[in-house]
Swiss-Prot record:
<dbReference type="GO" id="GO:0005829">
    <property type="term" value="C:cytosol"/>
</dbReference>
<dbReference type="InterPro" id="IPR015875">
    <property type="entry name" value="IMP_DH/GMP_Rdtase_CS"/>
</dbReference>
<dbReference type="GO" id="GO:0006163">
    <property type="term" value="P:purine nucleotide metabolic process"/>
</dbReference>
<dbReference type="InterPro" id="IPR001093">
    <property type="entry name" value="IMP_DH_GMPRt"/>
</dbReference>
<keyword id="KW-0521">NADP</keyword>
<dbReference type="GO" id="GO:0003920">
    <property type="term" value="F:GMP reductase activity"/>
</dbReference>
<comment type="similarity">
    <text>Belongs to the IMPDH/GMPR family. GuaC type 2 subfamily.</text>
</comment>
<protein>
    <recommendedName>
        <fullName>GMP reductase</fullName>
        <ecNumber>1.7.1.7</ecNumber>
    </recommendedName>
</protein>
<dbReference type="InterPro" id="IPR005994">
    <property type="entry name" value="GuaC_type_2"/>
</dbReference>
<keyword id="KW-0560">Oxidoreductase</keyword>
<dbReference type="InterPro" id="IPR013785">
    <property type="entry name" value="Aldolase_TIM"/>
</dbReference>
<comment type="function">
    <text>Catalyzes the irreversible NADPH-dependent deamination of GMP to IMP. It functions in the conversion of nucleobase, nucleoside and nucleotide derivatives of G to A nucleotides, and in maintaining the intracellular balance of A and G nucleotides.</text>
</comment>
<dbReference type="GO" id="GO:1902560">
    <property type="term" value="C:GMP reductase complex"/>
</dbReference>
<dbReference type="InterPro" id="IPR050139">
    <property type="entry name" value="GMP_reductase"/>
</dbReference>
<feature type="active site" description="Thioimidate intermediate">
    <location>
        <position position="176"/>
    </location>
</feature>
<feature type="binding site">
    <location>
        <begin position="205"/>
        <end position="228"/>
    </location>
    <ligand>
        <name>NADP(+)</name>
    </ligand>
</feature>
<dbReference type="Pfam" id="PF00478">
    <property type="entry name" value="IMPDH"/>
</dbReference>
Length: 327
């Protein structure tokens, strides 16, 4: 029964250190394998229009990071795949589940992307299962990520349909208001939901949403994630696609949810909002700091790579990260 499982979130958990076996944090290996490919970090900038664009996607791919291009400029996806392949880079795109997306997937047979993410808010749906099967029939070599979900049953169904990885998280993100608008979601217990889903998974799990600090990446891996999708920590950079806004002499970047009226262009079935984030330097600096912090996490775990994080003990201490405990 669900009511028998412990419920907690990132701020409620502290990982317990083990004896360090490396002489320098720089020796810790933060690389991760997804499908046939290895990447520098187990993190993915959220496939949102204010987080990633083609320029950032290209740069991430060149530097060895994983990315997922958003699906909100449908006509540009095919040229994007071609351009990435011409440079010898992986192509990783998103699709929805509308009828036109079936034709689009079929049209990719001659130049199939390495990764496709089926990206809808409630991924435990027949429409997602049908799309997984369609992609696997038309593009059998393409790695399929499906989501988003929040239960073990959903993970098993999507895996059984052919998904190569599932994305876990229903509304825990900073600009998502699903739990407020609908009463449903994993907001406030995202880490426990991740643990619950990971126990049922046979394939990689991607934790999506609720990441507020770099330490949350290590916690996600401890509780079963292979990779971690992050929105707000990747928003607000100088090169971020979000619109630049000046307020009282200060510079901000817009950051809004994929189900917001700003993304949809209409006030209908809105489950996202828009916020302004202070501009915070370059994306490369954040990626470097994330890697260094994750290397420190590995050193505290007593290992040499990400796998060591999966075996550490932990304690549940309610609201152990609270008043002002931020980077």
């Amino acid at each position: 029964m669900f009511n028998d499982i412990p419920v907690f979130d990132y701020e409620d958990i502290q990982l317990i250190p083990n004896k360090c076996i490396i002489t320098s944090r720089s020796q810790a290996d933060t690389s991760v394998t997804l499908g046939k490919y290895q990447f520098k970090l187990p993190v993915i900038p959220a496939n949102m229009q204010t987080i990633i664009d083609e320029t950032i996607a290209e740069r991430l791919a060149k530097e060895g990071y994983f990315y997922i291009m958003h699906r909100f400029d449908e006509d540009s996806r095919k040229p994007f795949i071609k351009r990435m392949h011409e440079q010898g880079l992986i192509a990783s795109i998103s699709v929805g589940v509308k009828a036109c997306e079936y034709e689009f997937v079929t049209s990719l047979k001659e130049d199939a992307p390495e990764f496709i993410t089926i990206d809808i808010a409630h991924g435990h749906a027949n429409s997602v299962i049908d799309m997984i099967k369609h992609i696997k029939t038309e593009l059998p070599e393409t790695f399929v990520i499906a989501g988003n979900v929040g239960t073990p049953e959903a993970v098993r169904e999507l895996e059984n349909a052919g998904a190569d990885a599932t994305k876990v998280g229903i509304g825990p993100g900073k600009v998502c208001i699903t739990k407020v608008k609908t009463g449903f979601g994993t907001g406030g217990w995202q880490l426990a939901a991740l643990r619950w889903c990971a126990k049922a998974a046979r394939k990689p799990i991607i934790a999506d949403g609720g990441i507020r600090t770099h330490g949350d990446i290590a916690k996600s891996i401890r509780f079963g994630a292979s990779m971690v999708m992050i929105g707000s920590l990747f928003a607000g950079h100088i090169e971020s696609p979000g619109k630049t806004v000046e307020v009282d002499g200060e510079t901000f970047k817009e950051y809004y949810g994929s189900a917001s009226e700003y993304q949809k262009g209409e006030h209908k079935n809105v489950e996202g909002k828009k916020i302004l984030l202070p501009t915070k330097g370059h994306l490369s600096d954040t990626l470097t700091e994330m890697q260094q912090d994750l290397q420190s996490s590995i050193s505290y775990a007593g290992g040499k790579d990400l796998d060591s994080l999966r075996h550490v003990d932990y304690v549940i201490v309610k609201n152990s990260i609270w008043n002002g405990d931020s980077i």
